[in-house]
UniProtKB/Swiss-Prot annotation:
It is found in: Cytoplasm. The gene is gpd1. GO terms for biological process: cellular response to osmotic stress; glycerol biosynthetic process; glycerol-3-phosphate catabolic process; glycerol-3-phosphate metabolic process. The modification Phosphoserine is found at S376. Substrate binds at K144, R296, N297. The modification Phosphothreonine is found at T382. One of its GO terms (cellular component) is nucleus. The keyword Transit peptide does not apply. This is Glycerol-3-phosphate dehydrogenase [NAD(+)] 1. Its main location: cytoplasm.
Amino acid sequence: MSGYGQQGVSAANIDSIRPKKRLSIGVVGSGNWGTAIAKICGENARAHGHHFRSKVRMWVFEEEIEYKGEKRKLTEVFNEAHENVKYLPGIECPPNVIAVPDVREVARRADILVFVVPHQFIERVCDQMVGLIRPGAVGISCIKGVAVSKEGVRLYSEVISEKLGIYCGVLSGANVANEVAREQFCETTIGFNPPNEVDIPREQIAAVFDRPYFSVVSVDDVAGVALGGALKNVVAMAVGFADGLEWGGNTKAAIMRRGLLEMQKFATTFFDSDPRTMVEQSCGIADLVTSCLGGRNNRCAEAFVKTGKSLETLEKELLGGQLLQGAATSKDVHEFLLTKDMVKDFPLFTAVYNISYEDMDPKDLIIVLQPLKEDSENEGGTETE
């Protein structure tokens, strides 16, 4: 499969590559997405035994659960049932995926560390791993979002790299965890462009994740891959507002188009990103469409308009208290744009922030979609069905 610029790399020819050594895979995180990823890693560790050691360790934040009428530790239940009965019930994981309650054990034993924890915990988790990483190890971040501070916008892969002193790539795409776990076909994108001293080829990284139902393409544009997964949540909020107002498909298509352009503009303005990433890869337009057609950000934004309830209330009612990432990201992005004096350059992102936090009437979103006079004064028009 081809990417942009240079050829995208897949795992299709992995068996023709002679590995320098068999690598161990560790998964940091065990929610529904973390467990789905661990399942994939476990399957590939067995399928490519000359590339990977069979055992895949998955760090599980230890907690007690009710299981068959008894109080049991979650790790014990997983290793007995080969199923994450709390976060991904009904999905069997291969027996070579082992749950461990100590993230330090995963850190010590893995050559490839796959990070799938909620973004608000990543720094704390990395702090526990400092000084324990194997020489030559690399990371892959499956965490969607960006870290924003007064210093600027950082990718979570950058946070991991800085904390642990390793190279870290990114995996992102139109990947709903439950659908992936049920082996419904989807595509994903890996951004992996390590320095020369990293001794693990991209094909081997792709082979950690590539399955017949989980099609992987690896490209160089790490920033573009990461930002697609973060910024699409803001656009999904805008489409959710439109759903709440019962606007039609034409209007929602316009929102998605404008949103995609702002995603692309943000990535190329503030990062060294290829503009084609957003339109050619699953991490861009495909993930955007999936989120806009019914993800949690879309649903909560629709309910925000229809019920008049605050986003904080809807987070409790619809998300079990989890943070609504689209709204939070819009706030982070808005504060960053203020420091750059570029708020007006991203009108859709700004509108989502203003509706979410500044009492802007959602109906005024339509104003953002109307072209400025100077943009259209020289355009002709034709009628279409």
